A protein has these predicted regions:
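Short, hydrophobic/aromatic alpha-helical segments in well-folded domains
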Residues: 25-28, 40, 44, 88, ...
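Short beta-strand edge/turn micro-motifs at domain boundaries
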Residues: 98-102, 124-128, 133-166
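Short, low-complexity N-terminal intrinsically disordered segments enriched in polar/charged residues
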Residues: 1-31, 35, 43
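Short, P/G- and charge-enriched loop/turn segments at secondary-structure junctions
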Residues: 76-80, 121-128
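Short, glycine/acidic-rich beta->alpha junctions
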Residues: 21, 82-84, 131-132
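Short, surface-exposed loop/helix-turn segments at secondary-structure junctions
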Residues: 113-125, 167
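Acidic/histidine-enriched, glycine/proline-rich intrinsically disordered or flexible terminal extensions
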Residues: 162-179
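A solvent-exposed, acidic/Ser-Thr-rich amphipathic alpha-helical stretch
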Residues: 38-111, 116
C-alpha cells in the first residue's frame, strides 16, 4: 500500500466515522425528547444554539432555553400521554467541521380515543395517531472532536414552499457531491 493509498483510506474512514457519530447524534433525539432529558439536550447543543419550529410554534435560542423545552409541563404531559418522536433516516452533507442533516420527523402519540384492536402475538392496542410530520434540518459543527447542534429547523410537511425547499437543499447537496 502506498502512502497515497493509505491517506485516501484514512480520509474515507474519517468520513465513515463522522457519519456514524452524526447518525448517533440524530438518533439520540427521539429518546431524549420522549424522556424529557434536559441534561442530554444541553450536552448536544452549542451555547448559542437555535431551535426553530417554524412560523406557528415557539422556538428557543441558547442551550438553556432549548433544554427547558423538555421540562415544560405541556411536554411532560405529552410524554405521559404516549408521545413518541419517530425519525426517518437522515441525509448527511459533510463539509469539513460542518454538516447539514436533512430528515423527516413524525410526532405520534397513543390514540386514547381509538378502539382497542388485537394483533396476534402482540396484544391489544388502541393504536397510535400521527400528530405531525415535519422536515427536520440540523446544522452541525464539530467542536473539540465532537459533533454539536448549532441550529435545528422543523417545518411541517404541508405542501408549502419552505419545507419543500429544505428537502431540495438537502437532496441537492447529496446530488452535487455524487455528481
Amino acid at each position: 500500500m502506498t502512502d497515497s493509498d493509505a491517506a485516501g483510506l484514512e480520509a474515507r474512514l474519517k468520513i465513515v466515522e463522522d457519519k456514524l457519530a452524526i447518525y448517533e447524534l440524530i438518533a439520540s433525539h427521539p429518546p431524549s425528547a420522549d424522556t424529557g432529558s434536559a441534561d442530554y439536550t444541553s450536552s448536544v447543543y452549542l451555547e448559542d444554539g437555535v431551535f426553530d419550529r417554524g412560523p406557528t410554534l415557539d422556538g428557543a435560542t441558547g442551550v438553556e432555553n432549548i433544554a427547558a423545552f423538555t421540562l415544560r409541563p405541556a411536554h411532560e404531559q405529552a410524554i405521559r400521554d404516549g408521545l413518541a418522536h419517530f425519525a426517518g433516516l437522515p441525509l448527511i452533507d459533510l463539509d469539513g467541521d460542518r454538516a447539514v442533516v436533512t430528515s423527516y420527523l413524525m410526532i405520534i402519540h397513543l390514540d386514547h380515543k381509538g378502539r382497542s384492536r388485537e394483533l396476534p402475538n402482540h396484544g391489544a392496542s388502541q393504536g397510535y395517531r400521527i400528530h405531525r410530520v415535519v422536515v427536520n434540518r440540523w446544522e452541525l459543527e464539530r467542536r473539540n472532536r465532537r459533533w454539536m447542534i448549532a441550529k435545528r429547523t422543523l417545518l411541517p410537511v404541508d405542501g408549502s414552499e419552505p419545507p419543500l425547499e429544505l428537502l431540495r437543499r438537502g437532496l441537492g447537496a447529496i446530488r452535487r457531491r455524487n455528481a
